[in-house]
Design a protein with these regions (language model features):
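Catalytic pocket-lining loop regions of alpha/beta-barrel enzymes
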Residues: 1-76
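Short, structured helix-loop boundary elements
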Residues: 26, 60, 96, 115-118
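Residues that scaffold the ATP/ADP-binding catalytic core of kinase and kinase-like folds
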Residues: 15, 86-87, 128
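Divalent metal-coordination and catalytic microenvironments
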Residues: 30, 42, 80, 117, ...
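Active-site micro-motifs of SAM-dependent methyltransferase domains
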Residues: 49, 83, 127
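Mid-to-C-terminal alpha-helical segments outside catalytic/metal-binding sites
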Residues: 98-135
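Short acidic/histidine-rich active-site segments
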Residues: 73-95
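Residue-level signal for the nucleotide or nucleotide-sugar donor/cofactor binding architecture
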Residues: 7, 58, 94-97, 112
Length: 135
């Protein structure tokens, strides 16, 4: 289940808590830009947190602080193309190639190398999207 939640952190945390109580299921907090509590609840319930180009914006310091709290095995990186292009492409049409910029900021934020964050987030993507063929 891919979830895009905006300005509804408390409701989303309550819904996830209630629904996962009926049985675990894979879910992804897509294009995450919410607060630390939703990230904490999502991870605690077995979900993944995916960071987009928003992570690279100068004013996204709080989001980078939240990223530091997400376990590596529960994070992904994404483009959200054609929207939310990372710095230095902000304001332009986003494209998949730009995900490398977001990955670089995520790697720096959590203190690992870019190659390591690429490996980890790729493995996480295959884990959550388990039917996706490895090419």
């Amino acid at each position: 289940l891919v979830i895009h939640s905006r300005a509804a952190d408390e409701d989303m945390a309550a819904i996830l808590t209630e629904e996962t109580g009926k049985g675990a299921f894979p879910f992804l907090l897509h294009c995450f830009s919410s607060g630390p509590e939703l990230a904490r609840v999502g991870v605690a319930l077995g979900g993944y947190v995916s960071f987009s180009g928003i992570l690279t914006f100068p004013k996204s310091e709080e989001l980078r602080e939240i990223a530091k709290t997400v376990p590596l095995e529960r994070m992904l990186v994404e483009t959200d193309a054609p929207y939310l292009a990372p710095k230095p492409f902000r304001g332009k049409r986003n494209e998949p190639a730009y995900v490398a910029h977001t990955a670089a900021v995520l790697a720096q934020t959590v203190g690992v190398g870019v190659e390591e964050i690429a490996r980890i987030t790729t493995e996480n993507a295959f884990r959550i999207f388990s039917k996706m063929p490895r090419v």
